[in-house]
């Protein structure tokens, strides 16, 4: 029996696996999927009993027509190999195909229900398309008939500025590139060097469900739903339906139809504008003619201008005739009024008025003589003296009355206070905390006693409680303290 080292037996196993199987196809359900930072894709293919580890290297990930997704039933093609350092075998996959359209349709239906539950298909989310966009952004492959059809149709209908964002329209790179293109157009600023489009078109020609699968990826649907720019989806033919069709603002059956939705026909628009202009001119001409005829009808109903001025001219003539007499009468009335107002200003009247004012001033001056002031001061002094005497008498009476009330209250306090009771032979007992003791049991429990008599206080120590004895008969003349 030959003897092998670990490295030797691992190498033999690797050579046996690779030589015996070579390139193989394996059918199973995709399990765990993980893409490393390096770009390599690691996943499992499993059935109800076993699991096969698979790897797709970074350079081959982009060429996959279907990206492995957990739960998807696929057929993978690759080469079986072994890793001696880990004692594991692995399938290096370079091609992934869906095991059947039924699996893809089930996955598509699952995604549709999820996105619909989130409200991404709601009609109220869909925005109207701009009537005549200035700039149209097209997301598609830069080669092929799709972009040529769109540009040709736009040029025929109404030439617009078009920005093309080239993307892969199938394969593993399709979904991330389309999502990045939608997000990228939305990041353009309206006034930037590269202006922001007013409308987006995501377009691709027809193909199998596997070819169109990139437009069924969740990342594409969410990017289209989040777009702030109105978006038309034109993926596949009229019978092809993808997830992006449900979240876009409008769905076009073909890329050519998307271009027709985007812009009106320029010639039709010019013809319509010309027709509307002609209608407006005819309407304006008719309106002017109607107004002119109406003006002529109204002018015939008006009187002649000369007849309108006859009556005012007669009133003016009569007023001119009365004007000189009216001026003379006005001057006479003003003269009479002036004479009436100037009568009190005669010299005799002025002298009488001045004399009366002098007599009044003399009377006032006599009241300000020194003797009159002395008499007034003396009278006010006597009045002040009388008021001072009355105030002193009232204060003395008030003070005496309050003193008597205070003495009476003090006598009542002494009568009702416990000091008077102490003077009759009673005492107040407190503990060392100053609390009042009213029973023998309280006094027995106290650590120290403080006894207050009428003439002072005595401090004494406490004593244990003694058995209760028959109380002595109180003297009949001694009353209760409380």
From Swiss-Prot:
Keyword field: Cytoplasm, Exonuclease, Hydrolase, Nuclease
GO cellular component: cytoplasm; exodeoxyribonuclease VII complex
Reactions listed under catalytic activity: Exonucleolytic cleavage in either 5'- to 3'- or 3'- to 5'-direction to yield nucleoside 5'-phosphates
Annotated region described as Disordered, given as residue ranges: 457-482
Protein name per Swiss-Prot or TrEMBL: Exodeoxyribonuclease 7 large subunit
Complex and partners: Heterooligomer composed of large and small subunits.
Presence of keyword Nucleus: no
Location of this chain's protein in the cell: Cytoplasm
């Amino acid at each position: 029996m030959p003897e092998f080292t670990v490295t030797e037996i691992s190498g033999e196993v690797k050579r046996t696996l690779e030589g015996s199987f070579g390139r193989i196809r394996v059918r199973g359900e995709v399990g765990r999927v993980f893409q490393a930072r390096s770009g390599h894709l690691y996943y499992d293919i499993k059935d109800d009993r076993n699991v096969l580890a698979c790897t797709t290297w970074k350079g081959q990930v982009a060429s996959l027509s279907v990206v492995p997704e957990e739960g998807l039933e696929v057929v993978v093609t690759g080469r079986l190999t072994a890793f001696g350092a880990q004692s594991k075998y692995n399938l290096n996959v370079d091609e992934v195909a869906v095991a059947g359209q039924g699996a893809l349709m089930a996955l598509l239906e699952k995604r549709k229900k999820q996105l619909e539950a989130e409200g991404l298909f709601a009609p109220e989310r869909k925005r109207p398309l701009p009537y005549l966009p200035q700039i149209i952004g097209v997301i598609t492959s830069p080669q092929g008939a799709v972009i040529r059809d769109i540009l040709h149709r736009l040029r025929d209908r109404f030439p617009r500025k078009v920005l093309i964002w080239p993307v892969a329209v199938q394969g593993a790179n399709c979904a991330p590139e389309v999502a990045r293109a939608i997000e990228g157009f939305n990041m353009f600023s309206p006034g930037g060097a590269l202006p922001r489009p007013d409308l987006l078109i995501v377009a691709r020609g027809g193909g199998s469900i596997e070819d169109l699968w990139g437009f069924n990826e969740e990342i594409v649907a969410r990017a289209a739903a989040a777009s702030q720019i109105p978006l038309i989806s034109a993926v596949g033919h009229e019978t092809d339906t993808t997830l992006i069709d449900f979240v876009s603002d409008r769905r076009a059956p073909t890329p050519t139809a998307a271009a027709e939705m985007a812009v009106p026909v320029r010639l039709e628009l010019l013809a319509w504008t010309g027709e509307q202009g002609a209608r407006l001119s005819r309407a304006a001409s008719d309106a002017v003619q109607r107004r002119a005829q109406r003006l002529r009808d109204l002018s015939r109903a008006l009187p002649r201008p000369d007849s309108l001025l006859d009556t005012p001219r007669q009133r003016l003539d009569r007023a001119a005739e009365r004007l000189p007499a009216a001026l003379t009468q006005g001057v006479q009335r003003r003269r009479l009024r002036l004479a009436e107002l100037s009568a009190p200003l005669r010299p005799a009247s002025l002298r009488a008025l001045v004399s009366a004012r002098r007599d009044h001033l003399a009377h006032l001056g006599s009241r300000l003589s020194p003797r009159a002031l002395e008499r007034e001061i003396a009278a006010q002094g006597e009045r002040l003296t009388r008021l001072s005497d009355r105030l002193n008498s009232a204060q003395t009476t008030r003070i005496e009355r309050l003193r008597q009330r205070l003495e009476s209250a003090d006598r009542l306090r002494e009568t009702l206070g416990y000091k008077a009771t102490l003077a009759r032979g009673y005492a107040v007992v407190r503990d060392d905390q100053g609390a009042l003791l009213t029973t023998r049991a309280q006094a027995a429990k106290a650590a120290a006693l403080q006894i207050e008599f009428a003439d002072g206080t005595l401090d004494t120590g406490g004593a244990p409680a003694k058995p209760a004895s028959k109380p002595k008969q109180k003297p009949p003349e001694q009353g209760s303290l409380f």
